[in-house]
Structure formats: structure tokens, C-alpha cells
Amino acid sequence: EYVINDLLKNGIISIILGRTAEKVNIKYNGKNILNKSIEKLRYQWEKTSYDLEKHQANPICIKEEIKNCYYRTIPKFYIPRELYKIINYPFSINKYKPKIAIINEEGSNGENEMAFCFLEVGFEVYNVNINDLATNRYNLNEFVGIAFVGGFSFSDVLGAAYGWYFSIVNNEKIRNQFVDFYNRKDTFSFGVCNGCQLMSLLGWIPKGITLEHNKSNRFESRYSLVRIEKSNAIMLNNMNGIEFGIWTAHAQGRIVVSETIQKGISKDKKKSMFPIKYLDDKNEITEKYPFNPNGSENGRCAVVSDNGRHFAIMPHPERCILKTQMPWIPENLDDKLNKYTHWILMFRNAYK
């Protein structure tokens, strides 16, 4: 309908030749030569790839993917009505520009996207390599915010973010800067992907939480559906209830919680500690592959500190703030959003 209207506006005559259906029906000389459902044909088309993947990844996950993808439906994205005006309304940036350090190390690759997000909402952004802290080019006491970026620091040869972690804790000058920053009451930090793994090692998110290898035993790059739940995370203020797509790209993103935490905190606190969850096509929290790309229990993909100021997430919201960065948005939401998606609200919340 949209295409036809656009063609008519431009004086182009068009004819509808047919419409898509749930079955492929091909006739020749009045006889059916093919009459099969899209699901069966898609499975036949993808079967060779699945057979190869069984030798390249965890075969249990691949079998699960075949089963779960066979009956896939269109997922529902949801943004509370009252947020549309906030997302689309020009964000008021005052003269005060808080300073944020975009922390990176050799092998990091997400600093440009992260810098753009914070620049877009009024921060004064600095690209800070760990070596800059050792040479006194910058000092963390200058900043109110830290963002640990994604990527593969030191190629993860020592384990995810371990090389980055050791470059901090094994240098007294650098280590003390991070300790002082964390202990201040006027600061916040945000870690994505490799940055999330680093925050776990530093203990900036609750101790006893580790990031382990994906159950699929391979790197996963997918467009996943997640839900934001109520928590004390300052960057998620007033965002609970949103269900939306987000990019994921990691090999070691499965959140594992120690028995001490499992037994030592209440169910409600445990729920608020992990404020973002993976969903399936029915918008239910899931551990099923590939909806949950790493197999984290109870769909967990983010974690926040007790005071709400330190927030870490495995997926990449910094790659999703613009509509043009999204591979797909339902038509009913696409029409309601202008330039930004709701993910911009995370960075606006940090500014506030």
C-alpha cells in the first residue's frame, strides 16, 4: 500500500501481481508441482547450514535453534505511550557539560559509538586510554563518569577483559585512581560487552558475578529482544516495561551467579540486580537459543550495583540509539519514533 501510494504520487502506474502467503504453490499446465509451507521450505534451505554448524558450535544449541526457529513469529516491541514524547522531544542541554572518560585499551573497538552517545546528550567527552592515566595526561578525578567500551582488549588471549584488568590493578598509580573514583559519591560508570566483563573483574558490580563462555561455544552476533525491568539503575530511570531490540556481539557473555549471592539475597533484590532480560518471540523471559544468545539463567544480560550508579550490560545499547542503526522496527513503532530509539534515554538519564 505504501509503495503503491508513492508510485501514484510520482505518476507511475503499477499493477499488483500477487500477494505473499504461508504456502508456496506453483502450478504448471494446471497441475500442482509444488505445494509446501514456507516453514518447510525454509528448513530445507537452511538444513545444510545447520548440519555444518553442528560441527562448529555446541550441537545441542544448534538443534535447539532448528526447533525454535521453525515456528518463529513476529515479536512484539513495546514502549510505554508516555515515553514517545520524551524520546522525540528535543533534549534540553544546559551550559554545564559533565566530563566523561571513554576508557579503552589495546583491542577495544567501541569508543566511537560510545563517545557519540554521550556527546549527543551534552557530555564533554574524552577518549582515555589506560596509558594516558599512567603518563598523567588525564586523571580520573577530573571526571564524573566512566564508560568502559566493548571490543576484545588484548584479543582476550588471557580471557575476556583479563589483560585490561591486569593493566589497571598491576599499576599502583592507575589502580588508585580507579579506587578513588569508585569511592566518590558523585560518580557513575557504564560498561558494555568487554567493559561489562571488566567491571565484573574489578568488583564494581556485585562480587560473585562472572561472565562465562556462551553455551553455544562460539561468538554470537544477533539482534535480540530484551525487556527493561524496574531497578535502581540511574541510567534506566523511568524505562521499565520497555521491550525492544538490541544488538548483541560477544563470545563470553553468560552471566553466572555464585551460590553466595543466590542464597544470600531476596528474590526481589535478585530481580532488580539484573534489570534487563532476553525475551523470546512470545515476549517471555527465556534461556532458549538463539533468543538468549549466551544461555544466561533467567535471561539475564545486565547487572547493576547496589547503589545504582555502576551499570554493566553485555548487549550494545550504544549501537542502537538511532532508528537508522536498527535492522528492523515494527511499523506501528517506526511511525511513532523520529530520530532516536528509546535507548537514547539511558544516556540522557546519565546526564541528569
Task: Go through each PLM region and give its residues.
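Short acidic/histidine-rich motifs immediately flanking catalytic phosphotransfer sites
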Residues: 138-147
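Short helix-loop-beta junction
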Residues: 112-127
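Beta-strand->loop->alpha-helix junctions that form or flank phosphate-binding loops
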Residues: 6-30, 126-132, 210-218, 275-277
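Amide-donor transfer/coupling interface in amidating biosynthetic enzymes
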Residues: 17, 136-138, 175-180, 211-352
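Cysteine-nucleophile active-site neighborhood
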Residues: 152-233
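Generic beta-strand/beta-sheet core signal
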Residues: 1, 15-20, 29, 103-105, ...
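Residues that mark the start of a beta-strand
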Residues: 97-99, 124, 245
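Intein/HINT protein-splicing elements and their conserved insertion hotspots or analogous self-processing inserts
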Residues: 2-99, 107
